[in-house]
Amino acid sequence: ESGFSTFGHSDDTINSSYKSWFSKDKFNEDNIYSNTQVKSLAISNGKATHVNVEHNGQSYSVAVEKVILASGSLNTPKILLNSGYKNKHLGQHLKLHPVSGVAGKFSDLQNPWAGSMQGIYSDDNLFRKDNYGYLLEGLPMHPSLFFPFFPNNQDNFADFISSYNYWSGSIVLTSDTSSGSIINKNPQHLWKYNLNNFDHGNLLHGIENLVKANFLAGAEEIMVATSPTMHWKRESNEDIESFIGKVRKVRNEPFRILLGSAHQMGTARIHPN
């Protein structure tokens, strides 16, 4: 049993990041700073000379020889913009690989938090239309990942919680044609992203296939991460095709489908063109 591997692993026998990269014989832990935010880089003659940071509310300027800026697609553009860099692509072209999920409840224990974090994978529809589509993947369902995607479940909440170990989850990971952007505000920047109808169609197609897969696997109940939550129960005698028909009619509207982001990409292009 690997436990809640989604949030790290306490077993010293595996090659975790602490063992591979941050072991005491390889890395000086005094060089890691918590409660610290990088605000900008000081640039002189085209070279970064200092990193301007805020640590516990105090501002500092740290002299550097080299800088590797690896703050992710959501934060790197703001640091570069605040450092004086200008590029028409900077902060644009945000891709998120939008994700939504389906869960199935089974009569046998699933223990969705245990074992391999991703044991199911299908790329049959990765290039569904115009070289864009989606992946189907297994989901490591820690409670903090599972319950927020189904906040409008109408069942008794205590019963829903107690049934957790019988649920199995999976996601649709969409290769998006949609694009977002970074809005550079101080002190906190914002992110803007709207899912277009093309990507919404691919997402719904993937959700439909996950519903079918759970049904064929014998699920007693199936939930779709919409708002309100769409919930099918075998005991209700609702025809599964009727339920799938309702899924197909879900419109591309704000907050109608609960979405996550698998990966954030594309906002720090270097080439000016």
Model regions and ranges:
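Short beta-strand or tight-loop elements
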Residues: S34-T36, K47-T49, Y60, H263-G266, ...
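Glycine-rich loop(s) and the adjacent beta-strand/alpha-helix scaffold that form part
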Residues: T36, L41, H50-Y121
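Hydrophobic/aromatic beta-strand patches that form the interior of the parallel beta-sheet core
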Residues: Y33, I68, S168-S170
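Conserved redox-cofactor binding core of oxidoreductases
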Residues: E1-S40, S44, E221-I257
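Extended, folded domain segments that form the structural surfaces/walls around functional sites
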Residues: T76-N82, A213, E221-P228
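Generic, well-ordered alpha-helical scaffold segments in large soluble proteins
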Residues: K24, N28, A70, N82, ...
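FAD cofactor-binding and catalytic pocket of flavoenzymes
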Residues: N87-N214, E221, G245, E253-T267, ...
